[in-house]
């Protein structure tokens, strides 16, 4: 059922045919009077905007339901008089979400609203009909109008106009005149024929599927034909503003303000100036008539304009240094006593469902303090903004993204928020807020919230849910998994600024220089004035060890966005790598002041002082970092190293064991895990717990066999425990992996010298091996002797034969004399031969 734009008769579209129904003039007049929509003017004498209202209070879509309902019970004269009263545009008895329901930015769809395409209900009938659902007062009908900018969200007869316009465009020769009813029938037939022709051209041979869009004009909807000229101009202005046609919006808004002289109309004209970057004109408009003193919306807009003009002191003068709407303690006590006394007249202020202006002003105050580098007051203002209205998510995000709160303070603030204001949406909103908190603590709770959002609310592919997983992986040094998650998001949103910093960090950690180069090149072409662009370029040069170029672009990135923490830390790192300690300390100190809730600048300050051998100063900064984030393995590792250098090995072991406990779920091949294991092994070595130290090193060696330092450390421990062969093997392996390892070279030299000079036990493997080798040598020598005796030398043989002949002759002479020592003489001769042979 539709209402004709030019008459109050209604018609029903059935299969492309328009069936017309007549209404009596009396019924028509009653329809006009009962469905009259009254534009709200909160600046009327009966009510003005308060800090509990939002800009919805000045929206042209706000209606007065109760006033329209009470008009039916009034006499005609009294009813007309009431319509003329300016204060009739306001009624505080309506639902606090009434204006929100009527806003074009809100979509309220019932589950039983029919979809645009459904099969015909009666296939036997020549005209297939679809029964439409009747929409209640607070419900909106889904619209698939191609001519409507707002689609299914528009809650007024602006949708009716667009629907009729679409219908008029779809047929030829359709003319509607309230004076000629027959034209409607003819045009209905023409519409049916046109639809049939169009379907035949498209090749549809089956039954036609049509859609019946039924709207009922109620007191909560806008009927353009029932609005006054000024109200229609306001709708025109609003629609032009929503479509970013600022010249049209400015032209109409200026006329509306001149006609009405209403501060709300001045506010919307100022909005047009503000959105068109004409901030000076917005300031002149509001200050010329002192509108900031009578309209809180104009005051807020004036403060925004001053901020855009970087006139922060003027902006602070407009909105105040403190929240003027904060309750006085005495007033709060009085209200508490009256509530305890069951005072029925005491009630909470009724809001319109939008973000309260009080919260918006607190947020703007925080932005001003943040721009002035007054971070403590900025933190307090942002915290007050989110506590005043939990719907002000931007204030909550500023506290987290700008590192104004420590991880524990973030969770404390989250626990203090009252999510009951969201009603039935409490669960989803609580989880959506939780996934933005710090990942250094309560990681299990955040992981559980991610699972709930993915399973119960089908948000597994949502950017913020994936970003939460990215932050968890990056914090736990799971760079490969983090890189995969980042790439899934960047496939659909290539330049997502929330994902790019972690993605760039993963590329650097994994030494993926090619992807880092391509990303930096695309960013430089697309966003040459973005801080993330030059951060990526600087990180690429850092991966190439071109420190001077990296320093240049880190500086440029920090200038473009002074609140970009990663750029500040990278800029300070370049000075530290170049050995410029003073400049590095200055840069780290600046980052520590800019980001009071971040522990990394304090950690790096401690590392710089430790490199300068100022262990007491290093300890003080490490303690500050530990107080902010006690579960960061980097902090615990550096504290262990610091106490190791102070020869306090018991304390060093305490912090390193705690760090090892924290990184048990981290990637075992990450540099963080390896460093902690190595440092803990050296600590055990200093405490003469060599076996535990060896186990510690071998545990890492199972995960990373290509680390030269691990082999060097194991070689030293085996050398200390007199296991020379294992020591020499590991030291050789260390030098194979890193030939310029001076420690391994020195240790190997000592091991080889010790292997020569050290007296070993009889049971030592080297002794057993030596005995086996010596026995084999003797056997070989004996065999060689036997072989050498078989060699033929004529000269020697002649001498030996001559000698033997002489001996033989002497023996014969002795035998002739009857001597009895022939045997003995023979034996002595054999001994002398053997002796000669041995000497040879």
UniProtKB/Swiss-Prot annotation:
Phosphorylated by CDC28, which is required for the early mitotic activity of the APC/C in its CDC20-bound form. It holds the Pfam family TPR_12. Present with 2753 molecules/cell in log phase SD medium. GO terms for biological process: anaphase-promoting complex-dependent catabolic process; cell division; negative regulation of DNA-templated DNA replication initiation; positive regulation of mitotic metaphase/anaphase transition; protein ubiquitination; regulation of meiotic cell cycle; regulation of mitotic cell cycle. GO terms for cellular component: anaphase-promoting complex; cytoplasm; cytosol; nucleus. This is Anaphase-promoting complex subunit CDC16. It comes from the Eukaryota.
């Amino acid at each position: 059922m539709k209402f004709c734009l030019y008459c109050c008769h209604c018609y029903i579209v059935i299969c492309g045919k328009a069936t017309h129904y007549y209404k009596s003039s009396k019924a028509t007049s009653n329809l006009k009077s009962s469905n009259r929509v009254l534009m709200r003017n909160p600046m009327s004498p009966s009510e003005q905007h308060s800090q509990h209202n939002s800009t919805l209070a000045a929206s042209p879509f706000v209606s007065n339901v109760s006033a329209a309902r009470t008009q039916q019970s009034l006499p005609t004269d009294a009813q007309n008089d009431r319509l003329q009263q300016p204060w009739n545009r306001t009624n505080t008895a309506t639902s606090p979400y009434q204006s929100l329901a009527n806003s074009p930015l809100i979509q309220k769809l019932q589950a039983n609203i029919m979809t645009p395409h459904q099969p015909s209900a009666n296939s036997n009938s020549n005209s297939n009909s679809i029964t439409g659902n009747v929409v209640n007062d607070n419900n909106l009908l889904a619209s698939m109008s191609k001519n409507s900018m707002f689609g299914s969200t528009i809650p007024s007869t602006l949708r009716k106009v667009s629907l009729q316009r679409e219908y008029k465009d779809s047929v030829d020769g359709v003319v509607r005149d309230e004076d000629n009813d027959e034209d409607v029938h003819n045009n209905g037939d023409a519409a049916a024929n046109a639809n049939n022709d169009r379907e035949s051209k498209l090749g549809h041979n089956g039954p036609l599927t049509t859609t019946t869009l039924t709207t009922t004009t109620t007191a909560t909807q806008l009927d353009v034909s029932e609005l006054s000229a000024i109200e229609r101009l306001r709708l025109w202005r609003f629609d032009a503003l929503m479509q970013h046609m600022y010249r049209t919006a400015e032209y109409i808004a200026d006329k509306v303000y001149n006609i009405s002289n209403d501060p709300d109309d001045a506010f919307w004209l100022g909005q047009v100036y503000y959105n068109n970057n004409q901030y000076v004109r917005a300031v002149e408009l509001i200050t010329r008539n002192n509108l900031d003193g009578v309209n809180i919306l104009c005051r807020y807009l004036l403060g925004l304009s001053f901020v855009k003009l970087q006139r922060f002191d003027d902006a602070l003068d407009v909105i105040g240094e403190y929240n003027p709407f904060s309750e006085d303690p005495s007033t709060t006590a009085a209200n508490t006593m009256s509530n305890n006394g069951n005072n029925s007249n005491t009630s909470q202020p009724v809001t319109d469902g939008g973000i309260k202006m009080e919260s918006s002003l607190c947020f703007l105050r925080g932005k001003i303090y943040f721009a002035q580098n007054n971070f403590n007051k900025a933190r307090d203002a942002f915290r007050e903004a989110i506590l005043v209205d939990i719907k002000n998510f931007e204030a909550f995000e500023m506290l987290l993204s700008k590192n104004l709160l420590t991880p524990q303070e973030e969770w404390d603030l989250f626990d203090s928020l009252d999510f009951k204001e969201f009603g039935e949406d409490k669960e989803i909103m609580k989880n959506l807020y939780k996934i933005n908190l710090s990942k250094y603590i309560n990681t299990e709770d955040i992981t559980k919230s991610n699972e709930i959002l993915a399973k119960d609310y089908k948000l597994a592919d949502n950017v913020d849910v994936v970003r939460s997983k990215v932050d968890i992986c990056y914090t736990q040094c799971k760079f490969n998994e983090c890189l995969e998650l980042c790439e899934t998001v960047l496939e659909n949103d290539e330049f997502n600024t929330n994902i790019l910093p972690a993605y760039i960090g993963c590329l650097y950690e994994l030494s993926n220089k090619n992807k880092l180069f391509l990303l930096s090149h695309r960013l430089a072409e697309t966003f040459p004035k973005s801080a993330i662009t030059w951060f990526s370029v600087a990180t690429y040069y850092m991966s190439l060890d071109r420190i001077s170029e990296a320093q240049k672009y880190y500086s440029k990135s920090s200038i473009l966005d002074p609140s970009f923490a990663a750029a500040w830390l990278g800029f300070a790192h370049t000075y530290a790598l170049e050995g410029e300690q003073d400049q590095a300390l200055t840069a780290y100190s600046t980052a520590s002041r800019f980001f009071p809730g971040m522990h990394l600048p304090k950690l790096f300050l401690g590392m710089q002082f430790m490199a300068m051998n100022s262990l007491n100063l290093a300890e003080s900064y490490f303690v500050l970092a530990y107080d902010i984030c006690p579960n960061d393995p980097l902090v615990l590792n550096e504290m262990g190293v610091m106490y190791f250098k102070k020869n306090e090995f018991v304390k060093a072991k305490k912090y390193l064991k705690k760090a090892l406990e924290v990184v048990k779920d981290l990637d075992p091949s990450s540099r963080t895990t390896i460093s902690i294991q190595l440092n803990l092994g050296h600590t055990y070595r200093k405490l003469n717990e060599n076996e535990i130290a060896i186990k510690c090193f071998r545990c890492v060696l199972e995960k990373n066999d290509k680390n030269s330092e691990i082999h060097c450390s194991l070689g030293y421990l085996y050398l200390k425990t007199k296991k020379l062969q294992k020591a020499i093997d590991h030291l050789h392996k260390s030098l194979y992996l890193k030939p310029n390892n001076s420690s391994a070279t020195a240790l190997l030299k000592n091991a080889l010298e010790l292997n020569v000079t050290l007296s070993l036990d009889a049971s030592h493997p080297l002794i057993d091996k030596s005995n086996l080798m010596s026995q084999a040598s003797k056997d070989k020598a004996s065999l060689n002797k036997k072989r050498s005796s078989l060699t033929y030398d004529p000269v020697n043989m002649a001498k030996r034969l001559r000698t033997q002949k002489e001996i033989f002759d002497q023996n014969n002479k002795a035998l002739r004399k009857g001597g009895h020592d022939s045997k003995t003489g023979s034996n002595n001769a054999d001994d002398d031969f053997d002796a000669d042979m041995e000497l040879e």
